[in-house]
Amino acid sequence: MLEFYFRMEEEEMPMRDLADHVIARAQGTGKGITNLQLQKVLYFTIIEGIQQELIDKEWLQNNYDSEFFVWRYGPVVKDIYEEYSIYGASTIFEPRQETEEFNDLNDIIDNLLRQRVSRLVDRSHDHDHWLSNENQIEFGRSNVPYKLEDLINAAQSSR
């Protein structure tokens, strides 16, 4: 059983690692980040990374291991959201470390961190996948995932 635990600890979880990287960047600004803001920054980091050709389909296949879902306030990675839901609308204060493999995305992340979260929510609501599935949202959530193609389409249509 202990061996299983250690294997779990070493398992790569790229979306969670990207979330930790974003949190660390936000903490470095001294402002921190809320759970809602984290979700929007994660989403738009991927969208803008595709647009700037820093992220390609292979990167997505290797790193997009936890899907976003269509929720009231835009795309949400459910397991990451639930991990930080204890903070409510407050700043996440658990210290996190940046991951070198995501450093190419730092300019995008830093720019997104400067934007108002309400603006990011509104922008995410303009994307076709969210618009076409908004009616599936019940009590703020849906089980409609964003597939790789949905992310690529969002990046291409919002240039």
Per-region residue spans from a language model:
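Domain-edge interaction signal
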Residues: 1-159
